[in-house]
A protein has these predicted regions:
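Conserved N-terminal catalytic core of the sugar/cofactor nucleotidyltransferase
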Residues: 1-8, 16, 30-108, 112-117, ...
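Residues at the starts of beta-strands that form the adenosine-phosphate
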Residues: 5, 52-55, 128-130, 153, ...
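Short alpha-helical oligomerization interface
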Residues: 22-27
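Conserved beta-strand scaffold positions in the cores of enzyme catalytic domains, especially
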Residues: 28, 76-78, 129-132, 181-183
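Catalytic-core segments of class I nucleotidyltransferases/pyrophosphorylases
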Residues: 103-104, 111-126, 136-207
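A structural motif detector for beta-strand N-caps
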Residues: 213-224, 229-231, 235-246, 250-252, ...
Length: 280
């Protein structure tokens, strides 16, 4: 469809990721040395959805950082209330911008790799509701789980109030009850990066294709032992880093061992032991 618009939901606090998100919004947490927001905008661009007339991003927590990071690539809806508006309320606040168009909605914390997003929109008439789904728990929809993207018709979006509400109860379940919900299987790897464990798993999956599973950003200084890790731009690694992430500019001292963890500043560390079922 030529008139589809897109919304990146990026207003959340990222509470499950704290302390990683104490000073950095979830949307700007890097996966494979790329901020989640940039990943979301790139996957929309792969569908031909670009620019502030076609793509919107909502923001609430540390909104000034999100606005600065968008850099004019999308329309920004800044929510100013005491709490974020949620997945449905965020769309309600964008009704005037959406203005009658069907909308592709993607969560900023969705990590999608190695698969195609295009089937979500293929042969879509813009009237039904579609969910991208993947195998694995929690089995929310016919034994599958939501995979971070949905395609919604205007007739359902126009009813959404600009108040804290979620899409599960206001759109998806009503569409399911009406027999209007279509599930589209994602043929790649999907992770919800909202926890430290899944955030680490996404990073290591992104690094797996690099030599030795080492993804090292520009300007990083690495004199220590690094295996299966992501090292951010300008980071300094003198100790041992294994199955771990070192954020841009962060430091790992010679006497340190960073294993199954995220180093998010000079000394701040979050441990995140991986589950056996984490993708490789």
């Amino acid at each position: 469809m030529s008139d589809v618009c897109a919304v990146v939901l990026a207003a959340g606090e990222g509470r499950r990721l704290r302390p990683l998100t104490d000073r950095t919004p979830k949307a700007l947490c890097p996966v494979g040395n790329v901020p989640l927001l940039d990943m979301a905008l790139d996957r929309l661009a792969s569908l031909g959805l670009t620019g502030p007339d076609t793509v919107a991003v909502n923001a609430w927590y540390l909104a000034d950082q999100v606005v600065a990071a968008v850099r004019g690539r999308a329309h920004v809806s800044v929510e100013s209330g005491p709490a974020p508006l949620g997945t449905a309320g965020g769309l309600g606040a964008l009704r005037d911008w959406i203005d009658g168009r069907p909308v592709l909605v993607t969560n900023v914390d969705a990590y999608l790799a190695g698969g195609r997003l295009a089937p979500l929109l293929e042969d879509w008439d813009g009237d039904g509701t579609r969910l991208l789904v993947a195998a694995g728990p929690p089995a929310e929809f016919s034994g599958r789980r939501f995979a971070g993207c949905s395609a919604l018709p205007w007739r359902r979006v126009r009813q959404l109030p600009a108040e804290p509400t979620d899409l599960v109860r206001t759109v998806w379940r009503p569409a399911e009850a009406a027999g209007e919900l279509t599930l589209v299987d994602y043929d790649g790897v999907y992770l919800d990066t909202g926890t430290a464990e899944s955030y680490l798993a996404a990073n290591l999956h992104a690094a797996a294709a690099a030599p030795g599973g080492r993804l090292i950003g520009p300007g990083a200084t690495v004199t220590g032992r690094v295996n299966h890790a992501v090292i951010g731009a300008g980071a300094t690694v003198a100790g041992r880093v294994e199955r771990a992430v070192v954020w841009p500019g962060a430091i790992v001292r010679p006497d340190e061992q960073l294993v199954d963890a995220v180093r998010y500043d000079a000394g701040g560390t979050v441990t995140a032991a991986l589950n056996e079922g984490a993708p490789e």
